[in-house]
Amino acid sequence: MRTAFYISDGTAITAEVFGHALLSLFPVSFNHNTIPFVETEEQAHKVLQQISESFQDTGERPLVFYTIVNVDVRKIISKSVGINYNFLDQFVAPLEKVLGVPSKPEKHRTHSIHETTYDIRIEAVNYALANDDGSNLKDYDEADIILTGVSRSGKTPTSLYLALQYGIKAANYPFTEEDMGDMLKLPPTLRRYKHKLFGLTIAADRLHQIRSERRANSKYASIQQCRMELREVENLYRKEKIPFLNSTKYSIEEISAKILAETGLKRRKY
């Protein structure tokens, strides 16, 4: 199996994002190897050795995605036996021409602790943790969005991703079996914040699978219970005109992006 390397003199997040985005277009499996903080020539030569060993082991030239500011380190990596993709060289020079301004690369700037949005994102993460699963209703005034849905429909990971990636304060509220009764109704606590609500739903068989991993052979995980709860929440969404999304086939990243697109919430990442 071919190996893909993601290399940087910073966190390597940018190299990973670009590289994964490109590789996801192809129905091919890869071994992934991320190497951050390659800041010296000595470290760069060690990375070259890893790339060479991968080539020797697999017989296939590795794919090498890298974003390296240090010119000397970058030159060393560019000599690897792999197929090299230097994102900075490919994109910076054309941008300099268009903008009429030379770039001023700085290590760690992209994902630095010094970026102005760092405190905003950390505050949003703390908010998401404090307002998980309807645990702190008194803070809903601060929420940018309140995700609702049945247990295990993706509310918590989506809330945390929105916070960490975009600085959005996302609370989440679960609808449980006790809420169902004869017919699920919007709780008075939520009605006041109806304009902030966004619903998540999921296919019953997928919910059954997820819950069974947590509590096998329980009523909570039974397909009948899953179908009943999902039917009730989807009826509520339609009745109350709450926008909602079926999360079954989407990653957390995709769910979050779709929520932002539908609600118009502004990212606080940059």
UniProtKB/Swiss-Prot annotation:
Which one Pfam family would you cite for this protein? Answer: Kinase-PPPase
Write out the GO MF terms: ADP binding; ATP binding; phosphotransferase activity, phosphate group as acceptor; protein serine/threonine kinase activity
Catalytic activity, as annotated: [pyruvate, water dikinase] + ADP = [pyruvate, water dikinase]-phosphate + AMP + H(+); [pyruvate, water dikinase]-phosphate + phosphate + H(+) = [pyruvate, water dikinase] + diphosphate
Which cysteines in this chain are paired by disulphide bridges? none
Recorded hits in InterPro entries, A to Z, give: Kinase-pyrophosphorylase, PSRP
Enzyme Commission number: 2.7.11.33, 2.7.4.28
| Residues that hold ADP according to the record | 149-156
Q: Which UniProt keywords apply?
A: Kinase, Nucleotide-binding, Serine/threonine-protein kinase, Transferase
Q: Which family does it belong to?
A: Belongs to the pyruvate, phosphate/water dikinase regulatory protein family. PSRP subfamily.
Q: What does this protein do?
A: Bifunctional serine/threonine kinase and phosphorylase involved in the regulation of the phosphoenolpyruvate synthase (PEPS) by catalyzing its phosphorylation/dephosphorylation.
Q: What is this protein called?
A: Putative phosphoenolpyruvate synthase regulatory protein
Organism this protein belongs to? Alteromonas mediterranea (strain DSM 17117 / CIP 110805 / LMG 28347 / Deep ecotype)
